[in-house]
Regions:
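A donor-sugar binding/catalytic signature common to diverse glycosyltransferases
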Residues: 88-99, 109, 255-293
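Catalytic donor nucleotide-activated moiety binding site of glycosyltransferases and closely related
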Residues: 47-60, 211-247
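A nucleotide-sugar donor-handling region in carbohydrate enzymes
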Residues: 131-202
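Conserved donor-nucleotide binding/catalytic region of nucleotide-linked donor-dependent transferases
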Residues: 317-333, 353
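Conserved nucleotide-sugar phosphate-binding/catalytic loop shared by glycosyltransferases and other
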Residues: 24-69
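Donor nucleotide-activated moiety binding/catalytic core segment of transferases
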Residues: 72-76, 230-266
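Catalytic binding pocket for nucleotide-activated donors in carbohydrate/polymer assembly enzymes
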Residues: 276-317
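A conserved, positively charged/aromatic
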Residues: 108-110, 120-132, 257
Length: 355
């Protein structure tokens, strides 16, 4: 079989590199495509994944997103026409879903983010199959126009794909000039350019005031910030300069989290990764909690707190008895993942059925 896979975000790079590796191992020919987007391009290079760049990220406003997507559909259609895949796979790529639909190629959509309404509306109705976490009810998807019978669920969280056999890179601490004898608090900024969060700036989230308070009250702590975009990186440098470690290029996130004492996330993937790796994890997600976040909070492996003062108190309490907090977290995670299945196996089976 010939299979086209579109990789648009760092999470998709981690997920689809494992999927394409498995498919290639089974004798299938894979075409990987991506777009011009700093974090993804750097991570693909870091992981040694070869992908053809087609089009670019639309940026932070709706008009730019629309134009970039329309242009990318045209460019991608030529690439897909040339490759002639039997099946197309994406994590709700609006461009690949539209191209596959237009060329009558079965499209397998992998998605764990029904809260991202814009991309769901543009992809889910055009998909032959939707592969998603069992933690998300089917009714969260059927409202987008896909029949329940076309939804296949797996009992796992997506990051389990690359975390279950994780081998952390021991060079990450040296690379970021961190001391493993001192506590490390890692902050991940939110997805401020995502269509579902447009209108919220970095300054409006708890991240900035929280980092300021941590620096003021805990001089023994090393602070690491992982920005998503150049604009976020510039803002952090302007405010903190060299008082914190700001990841200037894409880093191996799971390896950093492995050495992290406490994690504070404004998004989804790194928050889930951190929790599953047994790190005491806090979320300051700036909007209504999405399905996976609700699941993590319900199972008490993530604490949701947007108030900077309350969050600071909880971080301090965690750091005061860090070993106990990590032991408790690890025990909860162990109970949670013992029945997880491998999502890649489920997806491979569905893709091969369509071929």
């Amino acid at each position: 079989m010939k299979i086209a896979i579109d990789i648009l975000t760092p999470k998709q790079c981690m997920f689809f590199s494992k999927l394409s590796e498995r498919l290639e191992g089974r004798g299938h020919k894979i075409l990987r495509t991506t777009r011009k987007y700093r974090e993804v391009n750097q991570l693909l290079e870091l992981k040694g994944v070869d992908a053809k760049i087609v089009g670019e990220h639309g940026g932070g406003d709706l008009a730019s997103k629309l134009k970039a997507s329309a242009k990318r559909i045209l460019e991608l259609s030529l690439v897909i026409e040339g490759f002639k895949p039997d099946v197309a796979v994406s994590f709700s790529s609006p461009e690949l879903a539209r191209v596959a639909f237009g060329l009558r190629i079965p499209h397998v959509c992998v998605n764990d983010s029904p809260h991202a309404e814009a991309v769901a509306k543009l992809t889910v109705p055009l998909s032959t199959k939707l592969l998603t976490s069992k933690m998300i009810p089917k009714k969260a998807w059927t409202k987008y126009g896909i029949p329940p019978d076309n939804i296949v669920q797996y009992n796992a969280l997506d990051p389990w794909v690359w975390l279950k056999n994780l081998k952390p890179d021991p060079q990450i601490l040296r690379q970021l000039m961190l001391d493993d004898s001192k506590p490390i608090i890692t902050f991940r900024t939110e997805e401020s350019f995502a269509s579902y969060l447009l209108g919220k700036s970095l300054a409006e989230t708890p991240i900035i005031p929280l980092i300021k308070q941590v620096l003021k009250r805990r001089r023994d702590v090393q602070v690491v910030a992982v920005p998503r975009y150049e604009e976020q990186k510039k803002s952090l440098f302007e405010i903190f300069n060299d008082k914190i470690t700001i990841c200037e290029s894409t880093v191996d996130g799971p390896s950093l989290l492995y050495h992290t004492s406490v994690f504070v996330g404004g998004g989804g993937t790194m928050t889930t990764e951190s929790a599953l790796l047994g790190v005491p994890t806090f979320s300051c997600y700036p909007s209504k909690p999405f399905e996976i976040l609700k699941y993590l909070v319900k199972n008490k492996i993530v604490t949701l707190e947007r108030n900077p003062n309350q969050l600071l108190k909880k971080i301090k309490s965690t750091l005061d008895d860090l070993e106990k907090a990590k032991k408790t977290q690890a025990e909860k995670v162990q109970m949670l993942v013992k029945d997880f299945e491998d999502p890649i196996e489920v997806i491979v089976a569905e893709v091969e059925k369509l071929g």
